[in-house]
UniProtKB/Swiss-Prot annotation:
The lineage of its organism: Bacteria, Bacillati, Actinomycetota, Actinomycetes, Mycobacteriales. The gene is pheA. Its EC number is 4.2.1.51. One of its GO terms (molecular function) is protein homodimerization activity. The record marks 184 as: Essential for activity. GO terms for biological process: L-phenylalanine biosynthetic process. One of its GO terms (cellular component) is cytoplasm. The keyword Ribonucleoprotein does not apply. It comes from Mycolicibacterium gilvum (strain PYR-GCK) (Mycobacterium gilvum (strain PYR-GCK)). It catalyses: prephenate + H(+) = 3-phenylpyruvate + CO2 + H2O. This is Prephenate dehydratase. Residues 3-191 form the Prephenate dehydratase domain. Pfam families: ACT (PF01842), PDT (PF00800). Residues 205-282 form the ACT domain.
């Protein structure tokens, strides 16, 4: 059974995403349904990806974007640095939180709240209205926050229902989130290999390093625009090697087997200082306008090559 590294300990949203990917048959070489993988808990998202690079796990399940704070920066940075990795699948979960406490603890007793920073940002308003003046204690994950409460390091935790149950805690409040329809997107990452087959509802992602010349980013974006490719996300991050130098993460609709996407990737490879391909994979839903099919001009050129003007 494939080993899948994830942000632990047991009870995180990432574990729930991993199990959902397994149940839906989205993990390569596992078509037998739930229970066909071995979850491997790690202390952080970078550690989960490092386990894949080291050969200690076949894949990693990591969060990459949420609807409140946008991209998950540790994931982006870890994908851009080190030995190349590739995304094979994605899954989006609706997210709400549980405020977990030890049995017998009331809201009046709470002075410290353990929380994963990403989770704390998503319940900031609720905490200010319902648990004002508490001290936030950073935790490595939502489940780790529950463990911190069980171990006595905080009176309450911003956690998950699963972790609350697993650590023998009580629920002070459930279904907590500042914004309705809060969602987090998770991706399955492995070593480079052939991408999943094109489905017609696909996403492709790349990381670009551009030469420091005027118009470099516009030129790169034009390679997508002129081919009718729908850019769904762009994020800049420092290279961390020299002040003022950046990498750009692009998400766009389509698959490497789409003619338009293939043409854009070839052009980006020519025009950019470096292109890291992060994969093409099924999204299971329409995330934007699909790339146009083989255009009339290309078909005309092909007829000329075949002697059929």
């Amino acid at each position: 059974m494939p080993g899948i590294a994830y942000l632990g300990p047991e009870g995180t949203f990432t574990e729930a995403a991993l199990r959902a990917l397994d149940a839906q048959g989205l993990i390569p070489a596992t078509q037998s349904g739930a229970g066909s993988v071995t979850p491997l808990a790690t202390d952080s998202t970078p550690a989960a990806l490092a386990a894949v690079r080291a050969g200690d796990a076949d894949f990693a399940c990591v969060p990459i974007e949420n609807s409140i704070d946008g991209p998950v920066i540790p994931t982006l940075d870890s994908l851009a640095d080190g030995v190349p990795l590739q995304i094979y699948a994605e899954l989006t979960l609706d997210v709400s939180f549980t405020i977990a406490v030890r049995p017998g603890v009331t809201a009046a007793d709470v002075r410290t709240v353990a929380a994963f920073p990403v989770a704390a940002a998503q319940v900031k308003r609720w905490l200010s209205e319902n648990l004002p003046n508490v001290e936030l204690v950073p935790s490595n994950s939502n489940a780790a926050a529950a463990r911190d409460v069980a171990d006595g390091r905080a009176e309450a935790a911003v956690s998950t229902a699963l972790a609350t149950e697993r650590y023998g805690l009580d629920t002070l409040a459930a279904g907590i989130v500042d914004e309705p329809n809060a969602r987090t997107r998770f991706v399955l990452v492995g070593c480079p290999g052939p991408p999943p087959k094109r489905t017609g509802s696909d996403r492709t992602s790349v990381v670009l390093r551009l030469d420091n010349v005027p118009g470099a980013l516009v030129t790169a974006m034009n390679e997508l625009a002129i081919r009718g490719i729908d850019l769904t996300g762009i994020e800049s991050r420092p290279t961390r090697t020299e002040l003022g130098t950046y990498r750009f993460y692009l998400d766009f609709v389509g698959h490497i087997d789409d003619d338009a996407v293939a043409g854009a990737l070839r052009a980006l490879h020519r025009r950019c200082a470096d292109v890291r391909y992060l994969g093409s994979w099924p999204t299971g839903e329409t995330g934007g306008a699909a790339p146009p099919p083989l255009d009339e001009a290309t078909a005309w050129l092909q007829r000329l090559r075949e002697g059929r003007p």
